[in-house]
């Protein structure tokens, strides 16, 4: 992969009932980024989401449910001819503790239905993922109710700190300095 990020998408489910849930931490990331850059996210039906242009890159918060996130990502990417390798997807990560945030280049979906759908719609898994840790409930049968509920106050504070850490590295992501971002986040 080469070049910098031209599309940043933050995954989550639409609606107030999901806004504060663990599954929406990718959307938290994107909303905070838009606020920090003084960008208003405007609803764009053709892109199935809320969109803003921020200098040389696009912000996208899908209005689809998590499992259909690929519709939004692919619509915007195809329209603006953005390659998968120029896309960053911010999403919740069960396999990391709350407070961890890591950058991953390509790979599978790891059981994440939003990523699975994006891979399907793009026809590629060669995009970057900003994996925001939310902890694991301990057993796979508890995953759905867990991700669809708000985090504890301590976890929320840790998640917000991780988001801030990731936001500080947006300039490097846009410039394509992925190795620096990985060094910063993974150490």
Curated annotation (Swiss-Prot):
Reactions listed under catalytic activity? an N-acyl-L-alpha-aminoacyl-tRNA + H2O = an N-acyl-L-amino acid + a tRNA + H(+)
Keyword RNA-binding belongs to the record:
yes
Known EC number: 3.1.1.29
Where, by residue number, is the active site?
A: 23
A molecular function GO annotation? peptidyl-tRNA hydrolase activity
Kindly name one Pfam family recorded for this protein: Pept_tRNA_hydro
Q: Which GO terms describe its cellular component?
A: cytoplasm
GO BP term (any one): protein quality control for misfolded or incompletely synthesized proteins
Annotated Gene3D superfamilies: Peptidyl-tRNA hydrolase (3.40.50.1470)
User: Which residues does the record give as tRNA binding sites?
Assistant: 18, 65, 67, 113
Q: Does the keyword Transmembrane apply?
A: no
Q: Which domain of life is it from?
A: Bacteria
Q: Where is this site: Discriminates between blocked and unblocked aminoacyl-tRNA?
A: 13
Q: What class of enzyme is it?
A: hydrolase
Which InterPro entries does this chain map to?
Pept_tRNA_hydro, Pept_tRNA_hydro_CS, Pept_tRNA_hydro_sf
Which compartments is it annotated to reside in? Cytoplasm
Q: Where is this site: Stabilizes the basic form of H active site to accept a proton?
A: 92
What is this protein's function? Answer: Hydrolyzes ribosome-free peptidyl-tRNAs (with 1 or more amino acids incorporated), which drop off the ribosome during protein synthesis, or as a result of ribosome stalling. Catalyzes the release of premature peptidyl moieties from peptidyl-tRNA molecules trapped in stalled 50S ribosomal subunits, and thus maintains levels of free tRNAs and 50S ribosomes.
Q: Which family does it belong to?
A: Belongs to the PTH family.
NCBIfam families according to UniProt: pth
Its quaternary organisation is: Monomer.
User: What PANTHER family does UniProt report for this protein, alphabetically?
Assistant: PEPTIDYL-TRNA HYDROLASE
Q: What is this protein called?
A: Peptidyl-tRNA hydrolase
Q: Taxonomy-wise, where does this protein's organism fall, top ranks first?
A: Bacteria, Pseudomonadati, Pseudomonadota, Gammaproteobacteria, Legionellales
